Amino acid sequence: MSAPAIQITGLTKSFGDVHALRGVDMTIKQGEFFGLLGPNGAGKTTTINIVTGLVFRDEGSTEVFGKDTVKDFRFTRSKIGIAAQEFSVDWFFPIEKLLYFQAGYYGLTQEQAKPKIDDLFERLGLDKKRES
């Protein structure tokens, strides 16, 4: 039996004091048509952003074709595409981590991205803001 296309278990995410997701469980089988519907603020975008790796989950697990979406980020990005309405990131990410994430979208390893990111911080005079 093949792994589900998407498997979400106990997914939890908070933004400060706001609980966006609490214990979400969901299985989407391979080949299944699926719609994620709900009112504004229900957590649809947060769920999608976590599955696609744009936002880190607080608790729980998210898998795409049996691969953890955090540990196997590149695999996930190769299997799922998303066309966002607006640029969306976890605003609690340090700037440096966000830049490494963005570099990954262009196929750069952390080792390849490091000198480019270091150069950006130096040229922009933001070296002290890496962890902001």
Give residue ranges: language-model regions:
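Conserved ABC transporter NBD signature motif
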Residues: 60-71, 75-76
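Conserved ABC ATPase "signature" region
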Residues: 100, 104, 111-129
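Conserved beta-strand
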Residues: 8-11, 19-29, 60
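Helix-to-loop junction immediately C-terminal to a conserved catalytic motif
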Residues: 52
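Walker A (P-loop) phosphate-binding loop of ABC-type ATPase nucleotide-binding domains
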Residues: 39-43
